[in-house]
Amino acid sequence: MALEQAMQAARRGDLDVLRSLHAAGLLGPSLRDPLDALPVHHAARSGKLHCLRYLVEEVALPAVSRARNGATPAHDAAATGYLSCLQWLLTQGGCRVQEKDNSGATVLHLAARFGHPDVVNWLLYQGGANSAITTDTGALPIHYAAAKGDLPSMKLLVGHYPEGVNAQTNNGATPLYLACQEGHLEVTKYLVQECSADPHLRAQDGMTPLHAAAQMGHNPVLVWLVSFADVSFEQDHDGATAMHFAASRGHTKVLSWLLLHGAEISQDLWGGTPLHDAAENGELECCQILAVNGAGLDVRDHDGYTAADLADFNGHTHCSRYLRTVQTLSLEHRVLSRDPSMDLEAKQPDSGMSSPNTTMSVQPPNFDLGSPTSTLSNYDSCSSSHSSSKGQRSTRGARSSDLQSYMDMLNPEPRSKQGKPSSLPPPPPPSFPPPPPPGTQLPPPPPGYPAPNPPVGLHLDNIYMQTKNKLRHVEVDSLKKEPSSGDGYSGLRRQDSGLLRQDSELLLRHNTGLRRQDSDRKQRSFSKQPSTGDYYRQLGRSPGEPLAARPGMAHSEEAALLPGNHVHNGCSADSKASRELPPPPPPPPLPEALSSPPPAPPLPIEGAGAACGQRRSSSSTGSTKSFNMMSPTGDNSELLAEIKAGKSLKPTPQSKGLTTVFSGSGQPASQPESPQPAVSPGPSRARSPTPPASGPQPLLNGSIVPAPPATLAPGVHLDVEALIPTLDEQGRPIPEWKRQVMVRKLQQKMQEEEEQRRKEEEEEARLASLPAWRRDILRKKLEEEREQKRKEEERQKLEEIQRAKEQSEKLRTLGYDEAKLAPWQRQVILKKGEIPK
């Protein structure tokens, strides 16, 4: 009880409670929360300088005490951006500016990581901070500023330490690489144009900033690099090009731009083309774009698989059926004209961050059989001039039935739902032997028991879908299982970014499909381990908000600048050498109350990547993590979609008035410290025009009109006339005609509010049935329309006010007293300039 009271009082700035606890002898160095933080830490991270000084000077709590991750109160103050507390701790509290936590991060690293340029400025020019100090991962503060996209901090750090512009971390990441990977165009321009950053520097696996931008789908950054930075479409150490990265992640806009600007469809060192990557990951639209641009549908990789084979083995039957069907068509027949009426539904713009298939592995094709449309985007009915059509079968005499079967392929769902037999023959079986069964099979049942009945009528497609769904399902209990410290971090090269991971507390979710058992490519398993970054992520969280949604700690502030073993495309370069390295120190466990945060409806945002095998693993991932990294393989698409939908994770002036209070069990509670309203992290619904009961009541013809209820229960009839008062403010009875006018106006207002509420509910229900990526895009579009409508209404209101002022001025100029004029007289005067006799 004393622990919870002390922590809450330190965060709220309640000095009286702290004094009473101290008088009772309950405040001491042993009073620590589950992460070993003292009340001094909580006061520093909340900006309560008076409580901080009281705890240090009068209670004699140590100001240099460290939490479990090695963080001092100065680290907490720097991470949350409270400069006054940081200044006092460094000048009078005994903390030192160069002190590191367990990951090697100083207060300057944390200020740059969480985007506090005022703190960075003071530390550099008055606090004596050294911007050349690296963390255990080899990261400078400038790396964190680049990953955060904090241009003011970036300029300060470059001016203080220009040599850091091209500095590389232990895995070869430069600030430019991290800025491109996170899509920070302004930081990218600044580094290249003003700081002369080298865009050709490669990470240890050969990836360039161009590859990083293509992998994460940042089309503006990629376009700028190609246009102004003199970079070419080169390959990394595995032979992968930017097109491979874009195709594997479903970034159709990036893929289209690369094809239209001279990028070639080439093979990597495994013999795989971008079509192989797109098919293996179930990216149907990318398969279509590549198919109409001359990608070889019958090209086999070094394992002997075509793109359709890979789609089959990973359960992406919609891709495999499409690819096998278009093999019989000529290149001209593959291209469909684009229907402008489908722009909103079928031609959704690429989010620039993630593929739709990161949240659902089977993407429902958006095609209408009656009006065949393709999301092949930017192409007309002729193939691109630069595309290679090598290896394609030319069947110009294709029958119309072939084209119709191709159209059926684009949308197989309606036929199956209607129960009509499919006219399309089943796809031919693979030409290679099926994978051998696993060696550990159950023994046959005893002879006395009848053999189990085989499944009846289970189609091959359903088998794949059921297997895939089972592989994707993760029980909540598995999230609490902590892997051993020897587990290596391996990432999907074209499924997840390698050098930088987002600061999302979303547990990992990966598309898990059937693997080719006879392939020589190793499977990768992914696990989430707590790190010292968990401590910093808890500094300002409210109970109802997701973990990375605290103002001031944006999703992109995390950089997986991993040290230790050099990992080449996800595989350790030398397993023996990796075994010789000492294991990392055990990370602090998360509080039990925070180990499984509640999922945000309608999509679950929690999962665990228990076993995800992909053809290519991510670059530059190691077996240890820095303090602020959850896992280098975390997928941040859902979080980024929420950000695009309006869930801003950046600090806002309205959100500065919140102090987050942590209880002893690690469960925080939000406490307002100023009259400013708190900004909800989620997209709020349109507010009802009904004023709050605590505010001033509206006046209608000089009488108070009660506010109608926000919602009524179904079947409840509200007597509106009973809500209208019979007496005015002076106690005089209101005439009946006036009350009837007030009743009609109140009824109209209630009807408008009910109609608005009904529209909002219908809109939410319609959006809930859509995939997450499309739902967020449509929600953003609707919000933009509402904003435009609001601005238009404000403009009209201002025009009416201006018109009324001009009319009043005209009446005064003519010598009339506006208060003594009847409305009809006022209108006549304004129209003719005089009162009729």
From Swiss-Prot:
The keyword Cytoplasm belongs to this UniProt entry's keyword annotation:
yes
Q: Where is the composition biased (Pro residues)?
A: 423-455, 581-604
**Where in the cell?**
Cytoplasm, Cytoskeleton; Cell projection, Stereocilium; Cell projection, Microvillus; Cell junction
The UniProt regions of compositional bias labelled Polar residues, in chain numbering, are: 351-364, 627-636, 651-662
Q: Where is the composition biased (Basic and acidic residues)?
A: 339-348
- Any one GO CC term of the record: microvillus
Composition bias type Low complexity, residue spans: 376-395, 617-626, 663-673
Q: Where does this protein chiefly localize?
A: cytoplasm
- A GO term, aspect molecular function: actin filament binding
What PROSITE patterns does the record tag this protein with? ANK_REP_REGION (PS50297), ANK_REPEAT (PS50088), WH2 (PS51082)
Looking up Pfam families in the UniProt record yields: Ank (PF00023), Ank_2 (PF12796), Ank_4 (PF13637), WH2 (PF02205)
Stretches assigned to coiled coil? 738-814
Give residues where Phosphoserine occurs: S337, S341, S400, S401, S497, S504, S531, S631, S670, S674, S680
The region called Disordered is annotated at 339-459, 477-712, 745-767, 785-816
Q: In which tissues is it expressed?
A: Expressed at high concentration in the microvillar parallel actin bundle (PAB) of hair cells stereocilia in the cochlea and vestibular system. Detected also at high levels of a number of other sensory cell types, including taste receptor cells, solitary chemoreceptor cells, vomeronasal sensory neurons and Merkel cells. Isoform 1 is detected in testis. Isoforms 2 is detected in small intestine and kidney (at protein level). Isoforms 3, 4, 6 and 8 are expressed in Purkinje cells dendritic spines.
GO BP annotations of the record are: actin filament bundle assembly; actin filament organization; locomotory behavior; microvillar actin bundle assembly; negative regulation of cytoskeleton organization; parallel actin filament bundle assembly; positive regulation of filopodium assembly; sensory perception of sound
- Say if the entry is tagged with keyword Coiled coil: yes
Q: How does it assemble?
A: Monomer. Interacts with PFN2. Binds F-actin in a Ca(2+)-resistant fashion. Interacts (via N-terminal) with BAIAP2 (via SH3-domain). Interacts with MYO3A (via C-terminus). Interacts with MYO3B (via C-terminus).
Q: What does this protein do?
A: Multifunctional actin-bundling protein. Plays a major role in regulating the organization, dimension, dynamics and signaling capacities of the actin filament-rich microvilli in the mechanosensory and chemosensory cells. Required for the assembly and stabilization of the stereociliary parallel actin bundles. Plays a crucial role in the formation and maintenance of inner ear hair cell stereocilia. Involved in the elongation of actin in stereocilia. In extrastriolar hair cells, required for targeting MYO3B to stereocilia tips, and for regulation of stereocilia diameter and staircase formation.
Q: What is known of its domains?
A: The WH2-domain binds actin monomer and mediated actin bundle assembly.
Its protein name is Espin
UniProt source species: Rattus norvegicus
